[in-house]
Amino acid sequence: MTVRELLERKGGVVWTIAPSASVFEAIRIMAEKSIGALVVTEGSNLMGIISERDYARKVILQGRSSKQTSCREIMTGKVFYVTPERTLDECMALMTEKRIRHLPVIENGSLVGIVSIGDCIKAIVSKQEFIIEQLENYIRGG
């Protein structure tokens, strides 16, 4: 399965936040939307990504205030991303190698989606369940 196919299934909604926004605002959005990361953008420019992990390590463990800390201060600036043509296996390999959980999807210079490790696993398990069901039907003569 490709990233494009996954985005068509789950929708291409990408929640973003400005680098100047507070970490508190970022965490509020993540909690409200039940997501683990936000893409940090300035206009149409991808600036970074901020995750729950960034919050835990760079704010909580350092005793900083989420209301006084900007996303720019703790975001991961070196963002790994994929294009819609990539396969989910390629995404999982990249996430595993780089020890990350979210990949923005870029097409023609524009942010068109985000893929999480959970999205990949759900899609792959669903495909495997379908294959198993088909094989069981075949074995039963159906």
Spans of model-derived segments:
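Short flexible/disordered coil segments
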Residues: G77-K78, R101-G113, I139-G142
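A positional/architectural concept
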Residues: M1-M47
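Short, charge-rich amphipathic segments
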Residues: A21-E32, L61-I74, G109
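Tandem CBS (Bateman) regulatory domains
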Residues: M1-V13, S51-Y81, T87-T96, I117-G142
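A glycine-centered beta-loop-beta connector
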Residues: M30-K33, L38-D54, M95, L103-G118
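The conserved cystathionine-beta-synthase
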Residues: I17-S34, Y81-R99, I106
